[in-house]
Amino acid sequence: MAEEDFLSLTYRLPSLSFEAPLSGEERTFTQNIRMRAWALTVCGCAHAAFYCRLLTAFRCRLLDEAHFPNSWLAKYKILKSNRGALKIGVLGCGNFGKQLVFSLLQLTDLTAACISVSTRRPETLSDLTDLGIQCFYDNRRLAASVDVMFLCCLPSQLFAVSSQIRGSIPKACVVYSLVTAVPAARLKNFLAHGSIVRPHYSFYEQNPWSKLWETGKSPLKALEVQEVIEVTSPFKEAGLSCVGLKWFEEVMYSVLNFSYLLKVPHGLSVGRLNDLLFGPSDGVEAIDSPVLFSSESFVNASCIQSLSLSSPFPWFDLSSVSLRNTPLTKFFSLHPRLQCHLSFVYRMSMLKKKVLHDTDGCCGH
């Protein structure tokens, strides 16, 4: 018997437990709700960590380059700020926000100095401040100072939060919304900001979560289990994945927006992205001869014709990506086996294989 069971006030007193008055059907219903909440937390933390790893690796690849004649000033500003490291903000730090912070620290190359938290009661986050994470209550300050801001507040708090930070979010900042009840279009109106990544989660009745949801009490413990990593993959076929492939489209376009800031030629940006996603993986082989991305994978033919070889990609409105089909949507539909390779990259990333980029000594780390 676990020690925490003996400490429970209802130990060996089933009539006093919360579920005692519930019928069998009601107990099944509450168990399903708990399972979905756990699955949402695990998926949300895993996908956020994968996104930060990819963005960090891409930034480091570009910042390590030294031959962009139009990007010296932008590069100087980025390197001057936090030595070029990706700055992460978490707005709202309840149970989910705290699990997200721990996941980012353990599953990415981010250090505590890279993460800031704004919450109404920062004094309750001593476990985070002891790690060196800045915790305060100033939503406007947080929004104005980070590269990626994770929204982890309650839906009921979103309007008040939006009114506080509206107009303070830099164009280059990506708002990663984990407020699942609010669509991206509405969030864009609230924030007057278009760089929004919002994963849309769905959990079907016939899925493996019921067998896995008690695997670990925290996302970090759960994501040590390979089966859990497998089912959180966003690159599974429709009906099995907990998040649609549209999320990865938003991720890819948001990563490419960073190359716009440095005025990196579009061909070179795609080349660096291919290096990260299709490069050597510590000798582990994925699918043979995967189809690589090209500039045409991300923009239409008329846009390609307007770009010179030295031109960067245009700035992508991420909220529009979530609402309509893009050239990347078509590219994925034409090359379905590509998802197998991306699923491999995702699994290796979660297993902490150096499949994306070794960032030691890069970007100030």
List where the protein language model places each region.
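NAD(P)+-binding Rossmann beta1-loop-alpha1 motif at the extreme N-terminus of oxidoreductases
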Residues: 2-130, 136-137, 141, 257, ...
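Hydrophobic packing residues within well-ordered alpha-helices of enzyme cores
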Residues: 100, 128, 161-165, 187-188
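Short, conserved loop/helix-junction motifs that constitute active-site signature segments
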Residues: 109-110, 165-171, 189-192
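Conserved beta-strand segments of alpha/beta enzyme cores
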Residues: 114, 134, 174, 195-197
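Rossmann-like NAD(P)-binding element
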Residues: 120-123, 130-175
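Rossmann-fold dinucleotide-binding core
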Residues: 177-258, 262
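Interdomain hinge/lid region at the active-site interface
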Residues: 275-365
